[in-house]
């Protein structure tokens, strides 16, 4: 094996070999186990969230594969409607100076397919870099032929069951992209704005209790007053009780609107009077329905003012009454209209006052423009009938959330479901399978031929297909079963559905998880006709944040690319990556400064295994993770530790008799028996942690055993045997070295696939295992074997460790060289202590550098000593000639002074109220850690000083 571990030399060639040899495919043997990857956007590239979730999924997949399950990790990508269309539109404009309208729908869609063929595979290439053991031969795309058929089938069936309908309702409208968007694509931003207090004149000479002929409404959106249908007051608000049912003469448009009583108006907020605009506000829309108010749309698709308000009944039917808009406002952008309307109110003497006001403004996450609630004709799914079985599936335990607390989030959404708007005004996506005749009649079917056949429509009648496409989440909701061949009842569907676990983020529990549950329960039944769930467990991950706890985003310039941590990146390239193509270039200077400070030397290459192990080790259930480059560095060192330990094993076993192929006698040392027992305990804990989705505890278990038990202790304890033992003892230790390392590599493999495969290929033949044309990933996962745990050996070796540590502590405290042989005096020795010393003399002599043991009948006979204890056994080392007391006290005093100075500085900082109130949490945590460190150092140094002074 090479002297140093270099992941770049092994990773990519290994992966290619695994894929070519078909190791990722289901074996066809054993209990089925399946995971469906959340399909990443085809436009996307790997980010830390992907790396985190993919590490968890691959760990589970490899774990179950090695346990003998018939394992499928289903891979695929999402067509990502808006994201893909925008990307190709930008490319088209940059390269050819054209818009999609210049090309026309068909040619533009062909352009997107061309782009997908050329560039759409970026994320799948990156998935390979992570070591993802997905079955690439089964890769799906949400717009491939099979999935497109499934989407049409679901739409047609739901429509026949009256669960899909077309209606005029309020949606999040993006005036730049000209499409409805989902709540998830809306980014709410806190902004400083204004609250305009407007006077609305009362009609018919009506007066308020205090004699005014108007009431005052407060609004942050004066422009929408053109579409007002009423004013609401609280039914318990005595100021306005006499006005309920009376009318207002709406300024500028001179339209009469009613005053209604509704709980939506808060009598303690503002003036207590709320203008109601059902066509341009979601809350107002609900009030409007309750009072059967008309809906008056005042905006076109660009959010500019119409020439005439479009009027509809509260349930979306066209109305015949006029809602005129003054010509001077026609065609004005909504924000220009706002200024014009406020100016008119001021001119009319109807502007009461303007107040500064903080408000939350919805922006399109891709277009960056303010989203407008707009009345449009859209297709909807009736969610309520689908939601009840979906709630029951979680209540009765058919689906479990890990951590369980996310069930509450799920239920809070499911108890307040609204009908789902599934149409989008885009060209890229699943086109809605509905056709219209010239009179506007709508027909739904799988294709035009079916529509004509089922509705007896002659070929001479012109039909035109709906221009809209389906929400991307609609096809994603069918992911677990459409990927397995539905609507056909395929063997894959019977074998791998329901899937075992879904790994996802909390932010899409409603948008994706709940919809998958609803759709799957509705369409998929088992052999007994019982509705099937899409997955048995939902494992919910937190977000990965930067080291200060801030969300990673391009605008903050704190995004970390997983591949940069795997391969490394130079500082200049990193700066360019973080500051190039920014939406807000003015932030670039600060981002560059911060990047140069934090990553002065760029980012070193750490390899895939170190990244995966870090992600697993930080995966405490459901909590957000503050990324820590130091931990990544630490786990890169862990890979080195494993590599070097394996080299030690190979150097001491290759071309030696390791006792696997012969009947020659093997004698296991106490250390051999101990490490075998320790390994079994590790197998037990690690397996339990993975079964319970505690990847953090599983990683920690591996780390503790590998670094502290196997490397720090066992390898050291083998040296006396390998250098001085007889043949049987050496054979026993070599056999144990190989047995434990080979088994440990199999245990580690699910989390760290590359390094374990590389070492296993060298180690396994020494254990008599065949490695030609096979891989560690298809070997058996270690199973806990209680018979291999020798309790007496475990106790005895732990005692030996404590004894050695006691000697090392004395050396450390007294600054005695580790290589200096010592004489040891022992008092209060039990018969077990005596036995253990006699049986393990070679270990103690070698690892603690002890040349002589003396048992004392009376410890008062001992000269001046430094002492320590193992249980009741007192271990004493005579100090005469070992240390210079004065020099040692001088050294300790210097260290003490340094610790006290550091302690005082931190205490002063934490006593500063301004610092504590303004510092980020991560900074405070670091200061508190320093406080504990300096306090601890001071305590230990004072103890040390007292000991030396007592000599």
Curated annotation (Swiss-Prot):
PROSITE patterns named in the record: AA_TRNA_LIGASE_I
UniProt xrefs under SUPFAM superfamilies: Anticodon-binding domain of a subclass of class I aminoacyl-tRNA synthetases, Nucleotidylyl transferase, tRNA-binding arm, ValRS/IleRS/LeuRS editing domain
EC main group: ligase
Cellular localization per UniProt: Cytoplasm
Coiled-coil spans in chain: 879-950
Domain of life: Bacteria
Residues binding ATP: 554
Entry-linked InterPro entries: aa-tRNA-synth_I_CS (IPR001412), aa-tRNA-synth_Ia (IPR002300), Anticodon_Ia_Val (IPR033705), M/V/L/I-tRNA-synth_anticd-bd (IPR013155), Rossmann-like_a/b/a_fold (IPR014729), tRNA-bd_arm (IPR010978), tRNAsynth_Ia_anticodon-bd (IPR009080), Val-tRNA_synth_C_sf (IPR037118)
UniProt cross-references to Gene3D superfamilies, sorted A to Z: HUPs (3.40.50.620), Isoleucyl-tRNA Synthetase, Domain 1 (1.10.730.10), Valyl-tRNA synthetase, C-terminal domain (1.10.287.380), Valyl/Leucyl/Isoleucyl-tRNA synthetase, editing domain (3.90.740.10)
Matches recorded under HAMAP family: Val_tRNA_synth_type1
Family stated for the protein in its record: Belongs to the class-I aminoacyl-tRNA synthetase family. ValS type 1 subfamily.
This protein's name: Valine--tRNA ligase
Organism of provenance: Pseudoalteromonas translucida (strain TAC 125)
Gene responsible for this protein: valS
């Amino acid at each position: 094996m090479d002297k140093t571990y270099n992941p770049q030399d092994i990773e990519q060639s290994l992966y290619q070999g695994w894929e070519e040899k078909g190791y990722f495919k289901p074996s066809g043997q054993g209990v089925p186990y399946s995971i469906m990857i959340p399909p990443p956007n085809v436009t996307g590239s790997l980010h830390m969230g992907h790396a985190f979730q993919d590490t968890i999924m691959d760990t589970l997949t490899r774990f179950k594969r090695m346990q003998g399950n018939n394992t499928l990790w289903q891979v695929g990508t999402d067509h990502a409607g808006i994201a893909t269309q925008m990307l190709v539109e930008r490319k088209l404009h940059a390269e050819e100076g054209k818009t999609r309208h210049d090309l026309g729908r068909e040619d533009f869609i062909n352009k997107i397919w061309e782009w997908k063929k050329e560039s759409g595979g970026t994320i799948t290439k990156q998935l390979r870099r992570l070591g993802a053991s997905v079955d690439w031969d089964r890769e799906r795309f949400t717009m491939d032929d099979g999935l497109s058929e499934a989407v049409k089938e679901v739409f047609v069936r739901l429509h026949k069951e009256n669960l899909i309908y077309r209606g005029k309702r309020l949606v999040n409208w993006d005036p730049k992209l000209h499409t409805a968007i989902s709540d998830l694509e809306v980014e709410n931003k806190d902004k400083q704005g204004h609250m305009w207090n407007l006077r609305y004149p009362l009609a018919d000479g009506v007066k308020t209790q205090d004699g005014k002929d108007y009431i005052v409404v407060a609004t942050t959106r004066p422009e929408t007053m053109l579409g007002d249908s009423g004013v609401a007051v609280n039914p318990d608000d005595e100021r306005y009780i006499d006005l309920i049912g009376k009318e207002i003469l709406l300024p500028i448009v001179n339209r009469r609107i009613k005053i209604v009583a509704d709980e939506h108006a808060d009598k303690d907020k503002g003036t207590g009077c709320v203008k109601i605009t059902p066509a341009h506000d979601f809350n107002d829309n609900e009030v409007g329905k309750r009072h059967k108010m008309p809906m008056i749309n005042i905006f076109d698709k660009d959010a500019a003012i119409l020439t005439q308000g479009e009027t509809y009944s509260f349930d979306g039917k066209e109305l015949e009454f006029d809602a005129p808009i003054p010509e001077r406002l026609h065609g004005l952008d909504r924000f220009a209209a706002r200024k014009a309307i406020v100016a008119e109110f001021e001119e009319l003497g109807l502007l009461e006052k303007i107040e500064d006001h903080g408000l939350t403004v919805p922006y399109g996450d891709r277009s960056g423009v303010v989203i407008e609630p707009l009345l449009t004709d859209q297709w909807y799914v009736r969610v309520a009938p689908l939601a009840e079985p979906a709630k029951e599936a979680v209540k009765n335990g058919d689906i479990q959330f890990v951590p369980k607390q996310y069930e509450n989030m799920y239920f809070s959404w499911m108890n307040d479901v609204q009908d789902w708007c599934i149409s989008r005004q885009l060209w890229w996506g699943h086109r809605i399978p509905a056709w219209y005749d010239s009179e506007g009649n709508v027909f739904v079917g799988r294709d035009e031929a079916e529509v004509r056949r089922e509705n007896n429509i002659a070929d001479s009648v012109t039909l035109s297909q709906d221009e809209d496409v389906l929400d991307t989440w609609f096809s994603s909701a069918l992911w677990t079963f459409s990927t397995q061949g539905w609507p056909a009842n395929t063997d894959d569907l019977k074998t791998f559905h329901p899937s075992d676990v879904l790994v996802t983020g909390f932010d899409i529990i409603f948008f994706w998880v709940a919809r998958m549950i609803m759709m799957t329960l509705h369409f998929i039944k088992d052999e007994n006709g019982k509705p099937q769930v899409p997955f048995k467990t939902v494992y919910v991950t937190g977000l990965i944040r930067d080291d200060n706890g801030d969300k990673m985003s391009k605008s903050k310039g704190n995004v970390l690319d997983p591949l940069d941590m795997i391969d490394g990146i130079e500082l200049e390239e990193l700066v360019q990556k973080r500051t190039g193509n920014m939406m807000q270039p003015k932030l670039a200077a600060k981002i560059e400064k911060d990047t140069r400070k934090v990553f002065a030397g760029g980012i070193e290459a750490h390899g895939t295994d170190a990244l995966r192990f870090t992600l697993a080790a930080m995966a405490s259930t459901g909590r957000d993770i503050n990324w820590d480059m130091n931990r990544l560095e630490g786990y890169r060192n862990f890979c080195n530790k494993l590599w070097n330990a394996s080299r030690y094993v190979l150097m001491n076993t290759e071309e030696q008799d390791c006792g696997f192929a012969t009947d020659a006698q093997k004698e296991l040392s106490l250390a051999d028996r101990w490490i075998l027992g320790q390994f079994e305990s590790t197998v037990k804990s690690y397996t339990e942690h993975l079964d319970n989705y505690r990847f953090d505890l599983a990683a920690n278990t591996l780390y503790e055993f590998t670094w502290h038990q196997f490397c720090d202790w066992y390898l050291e304890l083998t040296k006396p045997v390998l250098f001085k033992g007889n043949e049987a003892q050496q054979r026993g230790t070599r056999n144990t070295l190989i047995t434990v390392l080979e088994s440990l590599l199999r245990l580690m493999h699910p989390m760290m696939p590359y390094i374990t495969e590389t070492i296993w290929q060298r180690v396994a033949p020494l254990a008599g295992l065949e490695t030609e044309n096979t891989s560690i990933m298809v070997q058996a996962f270690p199973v806990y074997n209680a018979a291999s745990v020798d309790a007496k050996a475990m106790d005895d070796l732990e005692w030996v460790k404590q004894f050695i540590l006691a000697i090392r502590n004395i050396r450390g405290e007294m600054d005695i060289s580790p290589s200096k042989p010592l004489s040891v005096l022992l008092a209060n020795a039990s018969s077990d202590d005596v036995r253990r010393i006699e049986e393990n003399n070679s270990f103690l002599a070698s690892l603690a550098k002890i040349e002589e043991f003396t048992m004392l009948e009376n410890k008062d006979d001992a000269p001046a000593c430094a002492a320590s204890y193992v249980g009741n056994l007192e271990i004493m080392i005579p100090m005469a000639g070992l240390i210079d007391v004065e020099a040692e006290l001088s050294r300790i005093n210097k260290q003490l002074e340094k610790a006290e100075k550091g302690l005082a500085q931190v205490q002063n900082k934490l006593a500063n109220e301004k610092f504590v109130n303004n510092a980020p949490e991560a900074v405070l945590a670091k200061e508190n850690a320093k406080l504990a460190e300096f306090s601890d150092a001071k305590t230990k140094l004072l103890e040390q000083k007292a000991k030396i002074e007592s000599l």
